[in-house]
């Protein structure tokens, strides 16, 4: 019986929340205000696997679904750090097996976000945000992390 119910479930296309909102719902406006400067965190997975933005190593016009969605939020200022899609160093087991390298990559990424003057680092990948939040806490930096869904939903 369970086999019958599960038949065809593998064919269901799974989408990341920003991909779904951007490509399927396609909002033209949001009744949300967030009067803050945010620095956009483009995760490796989001850029290179999910296509949430165009990777800098390809010679194509720049597009970014997260930036598009945040552009619908009133009063927000969106900036991006230098080397906007360089890895933050988390990468799952990489952070465990190469913790010193992972930590330095994360510090470098966080400092590039800090250099933008943003109050928040905003992204769609919880693991990247968690990694950077740990660095922010250890270094005592004056910047916070937020998942983009918190802003888009107005639940900040």
PLM segments and residue spans:
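Single conserved hydrophobic/aromatic residue that forms the stacking wall/gate
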Residues: 2-13
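Short, flexible loop segments at boundaries between secondary-structure elements
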Residues: 11-29, 83, 137-156
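Basic- and aromatic-lined ligand-binding clefts that recognize polyanionic substrates
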Residues: 25-74
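Local cysteine-cluster metal-coordination motifs and their immediate loop/turn environment
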Residues: 41-50, 83-98, 122-134
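Iron-sulfur (Fe-S) cluster-binding segments and ferredoxin-like electron-carrier domains
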Residues: 50-63, 93-104, 130-141
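A mid-sequence, solvent-exposed acidic-amphipathic segment
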Residues: 60-95
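A short, acidic, amphipathic alpha-helical segment used as a generic capping/interface helix at domain edges
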Residues: 101-117
């Amino acid at each position: 019986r369970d086999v019958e119910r599960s038949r065809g479930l593998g064919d269901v296309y799974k989408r990341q929340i920003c991909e779904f909102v951007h490509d399927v719902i396609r909002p033209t406006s949001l009744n949300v205000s967030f009067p803050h400067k945010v620095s956009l965190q483009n995760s490796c997975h989001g850029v290179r696997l999910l296509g949430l933005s165009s990777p800098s190593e390809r010679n194509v016009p720049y597009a970014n679904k997260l930036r598009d969605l945040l552009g619908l939020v009133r009063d927000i200022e969106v900036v991006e750090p230098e080397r906007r899609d360089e890895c933050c160093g988390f990468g799952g087991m990489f952070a465990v097996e190469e913790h010193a390298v992972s930590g330095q990559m994360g510090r470098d990424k966080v400092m590039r976000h800090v250099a933008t003057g943003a109050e928040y680092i905003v992204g769609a990948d919880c693991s990247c945000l968690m990694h950077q939040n740990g660095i922010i806490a250890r270094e005592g930096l004056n910047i916070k992390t937020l998942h983009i869904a918190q802003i888009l939903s107005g639940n900040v």
